Amino acid sequence: MSGKTIFITGASAGFGAACARMFASEDNKLILTARRIDPLLKLQEELSGRCEVQMIPLDVRDREAVQGAIEGLPERFRSIDILVNNAGLALGLEPAHRVDLDDWDTMVDTNIKGLMYCTRFVLPGMVARNSGHIINISSTAGAWPYPGGNVYGGTKAFVTQFSQNLRCDLLGTRVRVSCIQPGMAETEFSKVRFKGNEEAAAGVYQGTEPLTAEDIAETVRWIVSQPPHVNVNTLELMSIDQAWGPFAIHREQK
């Protein structure tokens, strides 16, 4: 995979940063976006000797900012070949009747609206060139319920369905759409979910060998390296230590 222009959201850490490192080569150009500037700057410095990097501090929840960032790209970066819609997060594990509504708003605005905005403003160029690939990062949480997953799971179910509907919209073009549904992966995800509580975050992975950010990046590499007539629609992957669980069951104590 070389000679491509790749736009990655949520590139400051986790899956996004791993994808940036994977795509970095002399012939690729990377557009890296994230809200957090310092880690984005460090990543740009790390990769600058390997490829051309355009760094954009960006909150994908801001529609006008997304539009301005994409339409304001330097000419040599405007023909985006691959969009990795990675920006997303989970906040809290409270049941629906006790949840902080601000957390719900943040998840909906980031996981759904942010992905929509980036797709909407990148896609016309792909359609005009009759070439491109959109990679949407969903989650097994969008397919399999668990207590406390309420809105987070709902947002990821949206990502999966939106990806499938995009495929229908783009039928007849050479623009591909793929959706990846990772299971448990050890990144900053749980630390963000538990709002900085590192002990709670570490407990999620205790005694397991979870997926890594690099596993997801390698999955992205495989998807985009398929022949142009092959579209990987939806790909679910889990650690060997994870499987589908039964429905939660409440049992009265005798």
Locate each region found by the language model.
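C-terminal helical subdomain
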Residues: 179-183, 199-246
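Residue(s) in the substrate-gating loop at a strand-loop-helix junction
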Residues: 139
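Conserved glycine-rich Rossmann-like NAD(P)H-binding loop of the short-chain dehydrogenase/reductase
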Residues: 26-42
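Conserved glycine-rich cofactor-binding loop
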Residues: 12-13
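Active-site helix of classical SDR
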Residues: 119, 155
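The beta1-alpha1 cofactor-binding region of Rossmann-like NAD(H)/NADP(H)-dependent oxidoreductases
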Residues: 57-68, 101
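Substrate-binding pocket helix/loop in short-chain dehydrogenase/reductase
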Residues: 94-96, 100-108
